[in-house]
């Protein structure tokens, strides 16, 4: 099996949440992070878009979403794109 590239949109709980802490935690939990960008949503809220490469294994995406959703300050995380690498 190969690898899968994922684009994940991580929404903080509020504009006051420290995004740098969330980004640091993501990098700690997922060493194969390729890119992290911020995307303004509105009213001061900024989403974090993460490009991540993971092994192509069954149940992998659900595990990743659950791990990201468990980070303090994260309201929700969802995979918005995926492709085989």
From Swiss-Prot:
GO molecular function: translation elongation factor activity
Keyword field: Elongation factor, Protein biosynthesis
Keyword Protein biosynthesis: yes
Entries under InterPro entries matching the protein: eEF-1beta-like_sf, EF1B_bsu/dsu_GNE, Transl_elong_EF1B/ribsomal_bS6, Transl_elong_EF1B_B_arc
UniProt xrefs under Pfam families: EF1_GNE
Function of the molecule: Promotes the exchange of GDP for GTP in EF-1-alpha/GDP, thus allowing the regeneration of EF-1-alpha/GTP that could then be used to form the ternary complex EF-1-alpha/GTP/AAtRNA.
Family: Belongs to the EF-1-beta/EF-1-delta family.
Protein name in UniProt: Elongation factor 1-beta
Species: Methanospirillum hungatei JF-1 (strain ATCC 27890 / DSM 864 / NBRC 100397 / JF-1)
């Amino acid at each position: 099996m190969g690898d899968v590239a994922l684009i994940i949109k991580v929404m903080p709980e509020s504009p006051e949440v420290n995004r740098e802490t969330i980004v640091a935690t993501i990098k700690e939990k997922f060493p194969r992070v390729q890119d992290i960008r911020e995307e303004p949503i509105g009213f001061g809220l900024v989403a974090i878009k993460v490009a991540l490469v993971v092994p192509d294994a069954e149940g992998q995406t659900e595990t990743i979403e659950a791990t990201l959703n468990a980070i303090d300050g994260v309201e929700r995380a969802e995979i918005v794109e995926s492709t085989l690498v």
